[in-house]
Swiss-Prot record:
Pfam families on file: GTP_EFTU, GTP_EFTU_D2, GTP_EFTU_D3
Name of the molecule in the record: Elongation factor Tu, chloroplastic
EC number(s) stated in the UniProt entry for this protein: 3.6.5.3
The family this protein is said to belong to: Belongs to the TRAFAC class translation factor GTPase superfamily. Classic translation factor GTPase family. EF-Tu/EF-1A subfamily.
Region (G5): 174-176
GO BP term, example: mitochondrial translational elongation
Keywords in alphabetical order: Chloroplast, Elongation factor, GTP-binding, Hydrolase, Magnesium, Metal-binding, Methylation, Nucleotide-binding, Plastid, Protein biosynthesis
Role: GTP hydrolase that promotes the GTP-dependent binding of aminoacyl-tRNA to the A-site of ribosomes during protein biosynthesis.
Subcellular location(s) of the protein: Plastid, Chloroplast
Gene: tufA
Length: 409
């Protein structure tokens, strides 16, 4: 059977459910697919289908994530849901599932819980730009004043983590009662069941409140170099995948990282042995560089639009350290530890200068399984920017994953 072609007729958005364990994230994911299936815009997925999330690897870390897709009238969504709390932490730090927005699920019966706060904090740190709240289990709260108090508490919590708590849409409802209604009658239309209507209302809010993101092709050009070849009579070719932006033959780019930044002109572009006029984000290309010798270029450098990225050696980061069971270290480590930091296409040795916990208290050591903030100094400058992901490796195996919070130097 021929594979279906992916038709791009609507804007595409990546979204996910976040929140405390047992507050109803997976049930809500099922309810959304079922409610939208009833409107003819998606395929229904049962709770069991979503909950048995397959394992996937991102930056050497195994994560369980369920991916579902659905459509509203205006948009196509790819939705991620993780079964376990550790999976969320790993997912968000590794950027395995980049989110343009998130639906924060909070049980109206419990209000914000420790993991609710941890997920909001993580969303802020790793750059999830927008959150919409689903106040689940509304049917378990008889008192409307109590419901208002929980909503206020959620808004306050979001504001504490620098999200616009006063403006964020908060939609009460019951994922379970929606799923039950849709299981009995999969063809329910708007106006026939109040619980299903609340799910449709949630998706209307997601449609309007979460903006369509700037796509990678519209950003400043950047390509991490994976390999360098010398072609007799033509010059030096750098190969790699265009991470963002677009590039045309004749444009000027900078070579950034590991050595002094140099400027060069692109004299040719090739993909699958054919020459191109222009390369776009996602393309694997060979780039012919004018006036550059093979030994001027090495794996780990980047080609970028001039003055859009700089080489740095010191940064602050949020990291997750793998447990022994996940293939990580068996013992704690201390300040001064010198692992390799794998950034884009290369390993660079770095020294961990200091650790702090979420509330910025100093920490003495880091145990396998910890999530911690750390300041790092690399022995060589490389192209780094806020929000960039990296892996921490030791002797070729991954022992942690991180995201850059800020550049120090």
């Amino acid at each position: 059977m021929a594979r279906q072609k992916f038709e791009r007729t609507k804007p595409h958005i990546n979204i996910g459910t976040i929140g405390h364990v047992d507050h109803g994230k997976t049930t809500l994911t099922a309810a959304i697919t079922m409610a939208l299936a009833a409107t003819g815009n998606s395929k229904a997925k049962r709770y069991e289908d979503i909950d048995s999330a397959p394992e996937e690897k991102a930056r050497g870390i195994t994560i369980n994530t369920a991916h579902v897709e659905y459509e509203t009238k205006n948009r196509h969504y790819a939705h991620v849901d993780c079964p376990g709390h550790a999976d969320y932490v790993k997912n968000m730090i590794t950027g395995a599932a980049q989110m343009d927005g998130a639906i924060l699920v909070v049980s109206a019966a419990d209000g914000p819980m420790p993991q609710t706060k941890e997920h909001i904090l993580l969303a802020k740190q790793v750059g999830v730009p927008n959150i919409v709240v689903f106040l689940n289990k509304e049917d378990q709260v008889d008192d409307s004043e109590l419901l208002e108090l929980v909503e206020l508490e959620i808004r306050e919590t979001l504001s504490n983590y620098e999200f616009p708590g006063d403006d964020i849409p908060v939609i009460p409802g019951s994922a379970l009662l929606s799923v039950e209604a849709l299981t009995k009658n999969p063809k329910i239309t708007k106006g026939e069941n109040k619980w299903v209507d609340k799910i449709l209302n949630l998706m209307d809010q997601v449609d309007s409140y979460i903006p369509t993101p700037t796509r990678d092709t519209e950003k400043d050009f950047l390509m991490a170099i994976e390999d360098v070849l010398s072609i007799t009579g033509r010059g030096t070719v750098a190969t790699g995948r265009v991470e963002r932006g677009t590039i045309k033959v004749g444009e000027t780019v900078e070579l950034v990282g590991l050595k002094d930044t140099r400027s060069t002109t692109i004299t040719g572009l090739e993909m699958f042995q054919k020459s191109l006029d222009e390369a776009l984000a996602g393309d694997n290309v060979g780039v012919l560089l004018r006036g550059i010798q093979k030994n001027d270029v090495e794996r780990g450098m980047v080609l970028a639009k001039p003055r859009t990225i700089n080489p740095h050696t010191k940064f602050d980061s949020q990291v997750y350290i793998l447990t022994k069971e996940e293939g990580g270290r068996h013992t704690p480590f201390f300040e001064g530890y010198r692992p390799q930091f794998y950034v884009r296409t290369t390993d660079v040795t770095g020294k961990i200068e200091s650790f702090r916990s979420d509330n910025d208290n100093p920490a003495q050591m880091v145990m396998p399984g910890d999530r911690i903030k750390m300041k790092v100094e690399l022995i060589q400058p490389i192209a780094i920017e806020k929000g960039m992901r990296f892996a921490i490796r030791e002797g070729g195996r991954t022992v942690g994953a991180g995201v850059v919070l800020s550049i120090i130097q």
